[in-house]
């Protein structure tokens, strides 16, 4: 029989009609000789009623065989329910079954197919096809589909061209580790799976495409966390002849459309702009969460003359004030915060509380001489807790920024209904890598430096600024972009600043440098992490919730057992040999 409609879409207007439904048995109940079935499909749940006095013995026998997750087909008459269930969209109606067929049986599932199920992440991933049956998960992917549909319509209307770029590309330095794919034809050579279509989309601008976009898979072999996966999807844009502001206007319009169509939220345009330096100094993060205050305060000058060398001789002393919550933090709680602070390079965490109008705590006695000034600067009040970090400016900012976010979550200070977008601009071009012992690109080596700082490419790299911009949402980096280098001389200077010899630059990026000999236009763009965006719209804290078949924290798939061993024949074809490092 042909399905008439989705079970979850049956409503009062269908009363009096005969329909056919197909789906899964969510629950079966026997009550007073009647059998009640909750039939589930992707649109919801519908109650079925099987009355032994109104159906054949075969139908009744089939109904008695039903168990959870059996796949069935039913035909019946839609009636009004005697007792409505306002928890269901179909709660005003039920289906009086006249015909029933079992399309497939099911073993007992390893966990219940319902929301808020308590089961380990690896079990969910091992049986992902069952996990995805849960209504909450289905809603996540309906939302994701709406987001991508909205984005495509918006960019199509602006005459962006959707172009697919290669999945098998060249491995290049800078950035995260590549996933490598050995070549059978060119033995000893390897492709790399793209970390982004960065260079190819720039070459499309050189080709005259003017406006490009792609919703594209990317791959990075990096340590995983809640908002990272080894393979992920980004909304990739590139444009020619547009300014930084014009690109940002396009992106803001796209996000506004998505928010309106998926969340019915009217976002305020333009988005606020914040310099990188302000973000780091006031929020302790280059992706600040602006839904709450608790800004970092610089006390370096204030404490300079006190008789406490930990403060007076430190390069920087900064603090955050936890307003009105000192009584929530015992010494044991603060010890836990101290251990947390050490993860970010801090040597420790100093603190005082405001108790009975006075500063109290381990370092209070050292602050007596500046107590009035300190109280005024920090706007202290009764029951405030002040946390200090004395260290380099970088360590103080990073530590207090992390503490700020942790404490806000612990104290439930964040309005989860808010969506605070902002641009972080005026970025440094380079960042120092302790691991590499050199400066590396803060974004990538194709970012255009500001005209005012470009001369420092041959001088102090710490002073070079980039025409780069990140878009931030609620403390997450949603995406990043920049204007790109389009002049060969400037690109060669950039490579040299990063430590490439001319031969190395030509070996790695010769095709790009050659392209710059052929009228490369001014261009720029941006990429937004689609998984992360949908995660935030769905109110989740892990992108696995919005990726159909994600990996676990070990970059493994418990369902398919990927990555897996391959046969000796396959390795031999590729001239590969596995060495043990035991």
Swiss-Prot record:
L-aspartate binds at residues 174, 220, 443, 484. GO terms for biological process: aspartyl-tRNA aminoacylation. The keyword Ligase applies. PROSITE patterns: AA_TRNA_LIGASE_II (PS50862). Residues 198-201 are annotated as: Aspartate. InterPro entries: Aa-tRNA-synt_II, aa-tRNA-synth_II, aa-tRNA-synth_II/BPL/LPL, Asp-tRNA-ligase_1, Asp-tRNA-ligase_1_N, Asp/Asn-tRNA-synth_IIb, AspRS_core, GAD-like_sf. Its EC number is 6.1.1.12. It is found in: Cytoplasm. Keywords: Aminoacyl-tRNA synthetase, ATP-binding, Cytoplasm, Ligase, Nucleotide-binding, Protein biosynthesis. Its main location: cytoplasm. Pfam families: GAD (PF02938), tRNA-synt_2 (PF00152), tRNA_anti-codon (PF01336). It catalyses: tRNA(Asp) + L-aspartate + ATP = L-aspartyl-tRNA(Asp) + AMP + diphosphate. GO terms for cellular component: cytoplasm. Signal peptide: none annotated. CDD domains: AspRS_core (cd00777), EcAspRS_like_N (cd04317). One of its GO terms (molecular function) is transferase activity. ATP binds at residues 220-222, 229, 477, 529-532. It comes from the Bacteria. HAMAP family: Asp_tRNA_synth_type1. Belongs to the class-II aminoacyl-tRNA synthetase family. Type 1 subfamily. Homodimer. Catalyzes the attachment of L-aspartate to tRNA(Asp) in a two-step reaction: L-aspartate is first activated by ATP to form Asp-AMP and then transferred to the acceptor end of tRNA(Asp). This is Aspartate--tRNA ligase. It comes from Streptococcus pyogenes serotype M49 (strain NZ131).
């Amino acid at each position: 029989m042909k399905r008439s409609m989705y079970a979850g879409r049956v409503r009062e207007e269908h009363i009096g009609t005969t329909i056919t439904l197909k789906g899964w048995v969510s629950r079966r109940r026997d009550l007073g000789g009647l059998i009640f079935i909750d039939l589930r499909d992707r649109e919801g749940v519908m109650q079925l009623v099987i009355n032994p006095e109104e159906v054949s013995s075969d139908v009744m026998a089939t109904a008695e065989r039903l168990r959870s997750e059996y796949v069935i087909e039913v035909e019946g008459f839609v009636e009004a329910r005697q007792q409505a269930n306002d928890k269901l969209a179909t709660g005003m109606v039920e289906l009086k079954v006249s015909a029933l067929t079992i399309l497939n049986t099911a073993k007992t599932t390893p966990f219940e197919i319902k929301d808020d199920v308590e089961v380990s992440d690896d079990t969910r991933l091992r049986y992902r096809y069952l996990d995805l049956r849960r209504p909450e998960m289905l809603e996540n992917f309906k939302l994701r589909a709406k987001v991508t549909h909205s984005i495509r319509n918006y960019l199509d209307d602006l005459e962006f061209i959707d172009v697919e770029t290669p999945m098998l590309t060249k491995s290049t330095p800078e950035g995260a580790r590549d996933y490598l794919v050995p070549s059978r034809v060119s033995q000893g050579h390897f492709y790399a799976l793209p970390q982004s279509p960065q260079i190819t989309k720039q070459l499309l601008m050189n080709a005259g495409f003017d406006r490009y976009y792609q919703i594209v898979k990317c791959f990075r072999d990096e340590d995983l966390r809640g908002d990272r996966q080894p393979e992920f999807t980004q909304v990739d844009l590139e444009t020619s002849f547009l300014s930084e502001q014009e690109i940002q206007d396009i992106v803001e319009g796209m996000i506004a459309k998505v928010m309106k169509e998926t969340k019915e939220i009217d976002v305020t345009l333009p988005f606020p702009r914040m310099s990188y330096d302000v973000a780091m100094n006031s929020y302790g993060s280059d992706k600040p969460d602006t839904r709450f205050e608790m800004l970092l305060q610089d006390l370096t000058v204030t404490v300079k003359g006190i008789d406490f060398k930990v403060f007076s001789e430190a390069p920087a002393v900064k603090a955050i004030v936890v307003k009105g919550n000192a009584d929530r933090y015992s010494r044991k709680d603060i010890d836990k915060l101290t251990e947390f602070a050490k993860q970010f390079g801090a040597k420790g965490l100093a603190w005082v509380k405001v108790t009975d109008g006075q500063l109290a705590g381990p370092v209070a006695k050292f602050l007596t001489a500046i107590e009035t000034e300190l109280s005024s600067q920090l706007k202290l009040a009764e029951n405030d807790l002040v946390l200090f970090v004395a260290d380099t400016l970088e360590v103080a900012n990073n530590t207090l920024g992390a503490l700020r976010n942790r404490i806000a979550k612990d104290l439930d200070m964040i309005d989860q209904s808010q969506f605070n977008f902002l641009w972080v601009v005026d970025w440094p071009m380079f960042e120092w890598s302790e691991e590499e012992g050199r400066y590396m690109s803060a974004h990538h080596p194709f970012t255009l430096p500001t005209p005012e700082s470009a001369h420092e490419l041959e001088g102090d790299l710490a002073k070079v600024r980039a025409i780069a911009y990140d878009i931030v949402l609620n403390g997450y980096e949603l995406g990043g972009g920049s204007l790109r280098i389009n002049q060969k001389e400037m690109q060669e200077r950039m490579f040299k600043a990063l430590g490439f010899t001319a031969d190395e630059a030509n070996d790695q990026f010769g095709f790009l440098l050659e392209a710059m000999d052929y009228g490369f236009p001014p261009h720029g763009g941006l990429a937004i992490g689609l998984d992360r965006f949908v995660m935030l719209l769905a109110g989740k804290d892990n992108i696995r919730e919005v990726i159909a078949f994600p990996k676990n924290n070990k970059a493994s798939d418990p369902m398919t057992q990927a990555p897996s061993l391959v046969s000796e024949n396959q390795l031999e074809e590729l001239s590969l040999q596995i060495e043990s490092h035991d």
